[in-house]
C-alpha cells in the first residue's frame, strides 16, 4: 500500500531538489518465510532516502553495501554514477510479522556530483540529533541539514534540510525556513 505523495514534474520543479516522495501507511504483515519487497533495480543521478517509522527494511546493492534499518532509522543511498539495489522487509521482521510504516524521498544530485561513486549511509535513530521546540511545542529530529544550529546526521550533496517533527497537541509552533529554500510539509 505504497502511495506516491508527489511525483509530478511541475510540482517537483517548485520544490527542487526533491523528485519524488512515497509513503507506505501502517500495514500489518503476518509472519512468513516469503521475501517481500522490491528486487534488484537500477538508479542513477539521485539519492533515495528511506525512513522507517515502524518495522524493518533490509538493503543490499551492487557495490557491496548491506544494512537493516528499523523504527526511527534512516537509509540515505547516493546512486550517483549508478547502482543496482534491492529492498526487502528484514528476515527478522518477516519471521515475527508486525506493522510496517515507511517513507521514501528521492533527492536530485547537483550536476557536478551525478557521476561520483555510489554511497550508502545507514543512520540509526540514536545518532539523529533531536532539538526541543520552544514552550514544550514538540521536537525536531534533524536528519539532514540543520535546525536551530544543530547539524543533521546525514551527509548530503544537495543543500537540503530534512526534519522529522513531533508536535505537542494544542501547542502552536513556528518553524523557520532559511531564505532561498522551499518547504514541504507531510503530516502522517
Task: For the regions a language model picked out, list residue spans one by one.
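"Short basic amphipathic alpha-helical interaction patches in structured regions
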Residues: 63-70, 89-92, 119-122
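Generic beta-strand structural signal
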Residues: 47, 67, 73-75, 85, ...
Amino acid at each position: 500500500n505504497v502511495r506516491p505523495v508527489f511525483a509530478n514534474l511541475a510540482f517537483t520543479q517548485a520544490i527542487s531538489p526533491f523528485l519524488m516522495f512515497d509513503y507506505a501507511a501502517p500495514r500489518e504483515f503476518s509472519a512468513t518465510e516469503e521475501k517481500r519487497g522490491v528486487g534488484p533495480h537500477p538508479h542513477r543521478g539521485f539519492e533515495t532516502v528511506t525512513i522507517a517509522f515502524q518495522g524493518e527494511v533490509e538493503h543490499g546493492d551492487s557495490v557491496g553495501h548491506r544494512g537493516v534499518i528499523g523504527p526511527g532509522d534512516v537509509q540515505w543511498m547516493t546512486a550517483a554514477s549508478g547502482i543496482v539495489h534491492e529492498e526487502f522487509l528484514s528476515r527478522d521482521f518477516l519471521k515475527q510479522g508486525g506493522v510496517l510504516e515507511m517513507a521514501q524521498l528521492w533527492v536530485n544530485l547537483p550536476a557536478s556530483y551525478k557521476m561520483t561513486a555510489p554511497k550508502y549511509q545507514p543512520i540509526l535513530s540514536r545518532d539523529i540529533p533531536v532539538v526541543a521546540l520552544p514552550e514544550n511545542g514538540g521536537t525536531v529530529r534533524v536528519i539532514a541539514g540543520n535546525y536551530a544550529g544543530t547539524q543533521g546526521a546525514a551527509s548530503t550533496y544537495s543543500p537540503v534540510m530534512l526534519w522529522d517533527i513531533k508536535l505537542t497537541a494544542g501547542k502552536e509552533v513556528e518553524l523557520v525556513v532559511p531564505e532561498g529554500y522551499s518547504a514541504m510539509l507531510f503530516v502522517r
